[in-house]
Swiss-Prot record:
Residues 148-162, 193-202, 216-226, 280-290, 319-329, 351-364, 558-575, 672-681 have a biased composition (Basic and acidic residues). This is U3 small nucleolar ribonucleoprotein protein MPP10. It comes from Homo sapiens. Residues 105-202, 216-364, 558-606, 660-681 are annotated as: Disordered. Phosphorylated in M (mitotic) phase. Keywords: Acetylation, Chromosome, Coiled coil, Isopeptide bond, Nucleus, Phosphoprotein, Ribonucleoprotein, Ribosome biogenesis, rRNA processing, Ubl conjugation. Residues 253-264, 576-598 have a biased composition (Basic residues). The modification Phosphoserine is found at residues 61, 120, 139, 163, 167, 171, 242, 275, 289. Transmembrane segments: none annotated. Residues 109-138, 205-239, 284-324, 348-382, 469-490, 574-604, 648-670 form a coiled coil. GO terms for molecular function: RNA binding. The modification N6-acetyllysine is found at residue 609. There is a cross-link at residues 350, 382, 394, 555, 632, 649 (Glycyl lysine isopeptide (Lys-Gly) (interchain with G-Cter in SUMO2)).
Length: 681
């Protein structure tokens, strides 16, 4: 008892843990590390528990315990697979053995007894039917083959054994679905009407089916004879009102007449197999085949024209073909009568609308559709590649990296190597070998001493010079005098050397292909406005230096920069111009004031026009006459409402007092000062 209690407790504990975890499934939306560790420990418990209870027959994993420590999820899964794969194989083999054993049943004993009773009743009924059949066969066949009855009886008994009766309750207990389907098929066959078996019957041929088929053919021939008798009464010389009457006449013939051997199909020999997929496929084909309907309509028109001239038999065959085509086009749905009539009405309306349209109308429809699609393409927003000049702000980010760009390289292209060029080169080389002209290109070497080497020789010494300033000047003076004495040469020789150098330079420029221009003379002299190209390039003497100058060298750049139009000016440029105008205005006012003061000093009569006294007198005269009026400050006597106004007024008064006091002090000082010129003798 103790081990059983222990087993039950371990399983109950595992179930409670799993129940707690699955009780709140919303927790699994986030990562639950605690639950994960708990589940791994549960798997270990169950694995170890299973290993303890294993029999000797079941050989699972060789590991007696599941190892979890320092193992990741994949390694734990691999340990479980080692255990599960052989056990699953063992159970599959065991189940297949039990299924093959017919004596084993999953039903309870009470139901088995009921099934046996039902089976015995069915066997009794079937025995009676078999006896009746045997008597009929004996009466029909005589003593030809007495063993056939016994064979039939044995086969029926074996069928009854194989087909036990199943109830609705049994379906919940039996799990072999394929076996159930086979047994139900056998039952259905047994329930059908038993047919008479003959000696000729085998797996493919049955005499009873052939007799039934012949009887059906005889009945159809009798119907044909009746129809022929009715057709003899029809007057073929009677006038026909319209095509509809003709169609109705021949339609009756089609319905009554049988099909020819050329038009027989699978459904004429075997029962039709109906399925929803076939119906939907036919419906889709009908809706998607407008062009095919037009072609079929044209073929029908041709057939009608041919049928008027052909004989009656040919006409009947053409009508049968048309009937077959129409039957293919028809779609039948398992709907009630009202719904069926509505659907057929809608389909007929669509067909009629399609049939009414002429070829010109169809062409116009296609053309209109094409025009609409082209207009839509033209009106839609074009991609940035087709919008002309596009800046980086207008196109999407990193879109230029996906494009292959074509741009020109300003580089001289290498000559194309052809047969002609190679032959020319070979001829030149051969000719030089014949002439023994081995004068290879002279190797040019860079001069060891740079032209501006003197710049490198100047060393900067950060230490304070120990020499005095007088000593430094003395040394510089001595160096200059020594150089002058050392460099004294014959002036005629110097002149001849200069002339020869200039001549050889011009001759080299004209004759030598690999000409190196004369390097610049190292002079500590800044030459302004000298074109840089003169010393690096050999140009003809007739060309002036002005043609080689850059635009900036011809005309100096404005300090403010390039001249801009009003549209090109920025906010800073506009502000700069405004400040400049204000400054000029201020300067004009200052100059005007200076001129006025000079006039006052020089001549009082001329300056009287602009003096303050004259202006004040004129104002008084104007006020007396009434032409002008003074604007008085009437707000002085009024009381101040705010503290800010009071303190501002007080501050102004104090400033005025301070300024008056300073002026008086300056006047006193001026009076006290005595000039030196007055004290001169």
């Amino acid at each position: 008892m103790a081990p059983q209690v222990w087993r039950r407790r371990t399983l109950e504990r595992c179930l409670t843990e799993v129940g707690k975890a699955t009780g709140r499934p919303e927790c699994f939306l986030t990562i639950q590390e605690g639950l994960a560790s708990k589940f791994t420990s549960l798997t270990k418990v169950l694995y170890d528990f299973n290993k303890i209870l294993e029999n000797g027959r079941i050989h699972g994993s060789p590991l007696q315990k599941l190892v979890i420590e320092n193992f990741d999820d994949e390694q734990i899964w691999q340990q479980l697979e080692l255990q599960n794969e052989p056990i699953l194989q063992y159970f599959q083999n065991a189940v297949s053995e039990t299924i093959n054993d017919e004596d084993i049943s999953l039903l309870p004993e009470s139901e088995e007894q009921e099934r046996e009773e039902d089976g015995s009743e069915i066997e009794a009924d079937d025995k009676e039917d078999l006896e009746d059949l045997e008597e009929e066969e004996v009466s029909d066949m005589g003593n030809d083959d007495p063993e056939m009855g016994e064979r039939a009886e044995n086969s029926s008994k074996s069928d009854l054994r194989k087909s036990p009766v199943f109830s609705d309750e049994d379906s919940d207990l039996d799990f072999d679905i394929s076996k159930l389907e086979q047994q139900s098929k056998v039952q259905n066959k047994g329930q059908g009407k038993p047919r008479e078996k003959s000696i000729v019957d085998d797996k493919f041929f049955k005499l009873s089916e052939m007799e039934a088929y012949l009887e059906n053919i005889e009945k159809e021939e009798e119907r044909k004879d009746d129809n022929d008798e009715e057709e003899e009464d029809i007057d073929f010389f009677e006038d026909i009102d319209s095509d509809e009457d003709e169609g109705g006449l021949f339609g009756s013939k089609k319905l009554k007449s049988g099909k020819s051997s050329r038009n027989l199909k699978y459904k004429d020999f075997f029962d039709p197999v109906e399925s929803d997929e076939d119906i939907t496929n036919v419906h889709d084909d009908e809706l998607d085949s407008n062009k095919e309907d037009d072609e079929i309509a044209e073929e029908e028109a041709e057939e009608l024209s041919i049928s008027e001239t052909d004989e009656d038999d040919d006409l009947q065959e053409n009508e049968d073909n048309k009937q077959h085509k129409e039957s293919l086009k028809r779609v039948t749905f398992a709907l009630p009568d009202d719904a069926e009539t509505e659907d057929t009405g809608v389909l007929n309306v669509k067909k009629n609308s399609d049939e009414v349209k002429s070829s010109f109308e169809k062409r116009q429809e296609k053309m209109n559709e094409k025009i609409a699609s082209l207009e839509k393409e033209l009106l839609e927003k074009k991609p940035w590649q087709l919008q002309g000049e596009v800046t980086a702000q207008k196109r999407p980010e990193n879109s230029l990296l996906e494009e292959t760009l074509h741009f020109d390289h300003a580089v001289r292209m290498a000559p194309v190597i052809t047969e002609e060029t190679t032959l020319q080169l070979e001829d030149i080389i051969k000719q030089r070998i014949r002439d023994q002209a081995w004068d290879d290109v002279v190797r040019k070497e860079k001069p060891k001493e740079d032209a501006y080497e003197y710049k490198k020789r100047l060393t900067l010494d950060h230490e304070k010079s120990k020499l005095s300033l007088a000593e430094i000047y003395e040394q510089e003076y001595i160096k200059l005098n020594q150089q002058k004495t050392a460099e004294e040469e014959n002036p005629e020789h110097v002149e001849i050397q200069k002339m020869m150098d200039s001549l050889f330079l011009k001759l080299d420029a004209l004759s030598n292909f690999h000409f190196i221009p004369k390097p610049p003379v190292p002079e500590i002299k800044v030459v302004s406005n000298l074109p840089a190209i003169t010393m690096e390039e050999v140009a003809p003497v007739s060309v002036s230096d002005a043609a080689l100058l850059a635009p900036e060298e011809i005309k100096e750049k404005n300090k403010a920069g390039d001249i801009k139009t009003a549209a090109e000016k920025t906010a800073t440029d506009k502000k700069r111009e405004r400040r400049k105008k204000k400054y000029q205005k201020r300067m004009k006012i200052k100059e005007k004031e200076k001129r006025r003061k000079l006039l006052e000093k020089s001549s009082v009569d001329q300056a009287g026009k602009y003096s303050k006294t004259v202006a004040s007198e004129k104002l008084k005269q104007l006020t007396k006459t009434g032409k002008a009026s003074f604007i008085k400050d009437e707000g002085k006597d009024k009381a101040l409402k705010s503290s800010q106004a009071f303190f501002s007024k007080l501050q102004d008064q104090v400033k005025m007092q301070i300024n008056d006091a300073k002026k008086t002090e300056k006047k006193k000082k001026k009076r006290q000062d005595i000039s030196v010129h007055k004290l001169k003798l």
